[in-house]
Design a protein with these regions (language model features):
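Short N-terminal targeting/anchoring amphipathic segment
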Residues: 58-69
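Catalytic donor nucleotide-activated moiety binding site of glycosyltransferases and closely related
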Residues: 181-196
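Short beta-strand elements of ligand-binding domains
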Residues: 68, 88-94, 108
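N-terminal pre-catalytic "stem/leader" segment of glycosyltransferase-like enzymes
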Residues: 1-53, 60
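A nucleotide-sugar donor-handling region in carbohydrate enzymes
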Residues: 100-164
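Structural motif
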Residues: 2, 63-64, 88, 104, ...
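Glycosyltransferases and closely related glycan-assembly transferases
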Residues: 17, 74-88
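Charged helix-capping and loop-helix junction motifs
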Residues: 165-173
Length: 196
């Protein structure tokens, strides 16, 4: 079964749509969504469900659409409007439109969405499987007998936040001040966006 994955191209969104597609054992292709300038600033509930608001068009040949993020709502709705019951639409996160516009919505509990087609999660879904985690279980093997473990999951710069050397120094000095070296072990887990 083929699926089209729609996101804005951010890793956090890609990991969610790919995770669901892999869990459902779907063949999938990813389409990054870019709205035309004017429509970037308009909320989904005010944007017409039309492919004409997209910067680039794409070929659609799937039975399932999995979307994530605000900008992917519109092309998903446009495809549903065109193909009706011939396709099944799934949106991950709060779409900021009526839940009835999708066949299924998967969102974190804290989004407080309610509906017969809403599945609530604790945290975000992702593409790591139990098999992959089990295979890498020794990757972060830590001697817990002697020290308490502090784990820092470190992201990276985005359009709202820049990881400067000054900010990194501040962060690590703060950690060093709070957690003395002799009692704690720091485990830093970088993301693909973490600067070198």
């Amino acid at each position: 079964l083929k699926a089209l994955l729609l996101t804005q191209g951010m890793h956090g969104m890609i990991s969610q749509v790919e995770g669901l597609a892999k869990a459902l054992n779907l063949n999938y292709k990813h389409q990054e969504i870019k709205l035309k300038k004017f429509w970037k600033f308009i909320p989904p509930f005010l944007t017409p469900p039309s492919m004409s608001v997209l910067e680039t068009q794409f070929i659609f040949d799937s039975k399932i659409v999995i979307s994530c993020g605000r900008k992917s709502v519109i092309p998903s709705l446009a495809l549903k409007k065109k193909y009706k019951d011939k396709i099944f639409t799934i949106h991950i996160q709060d779409p900021k439109v009526s839940v009835d516009k999708f066949d299924l919505i998967i969102c974190p509990e804290h989004d407080n969405l309610v509906g017969q087609n809403v599945i609530k999660t604790i945290g975000a879904i992702h593409y790591l499987s139990e098999k992959e985690i089990s295979k890498e279980k020794n990757y972060l093997q830590v001697d817990r007998e002697t020290k308490k473990v502090i784990t820092l999951v470190l992201g990276g710069p985005n359009k709202y936040y820049d990881f400067s050397d000054k900010e990194m120094d501040f962060l690590f000095n703060k950690i060093k001040t709070i957690f003395t070296r002799d009692k704690y072990k720091l485990v830093v887990i970088p993301s693909y966006r973490t600067p070198p």
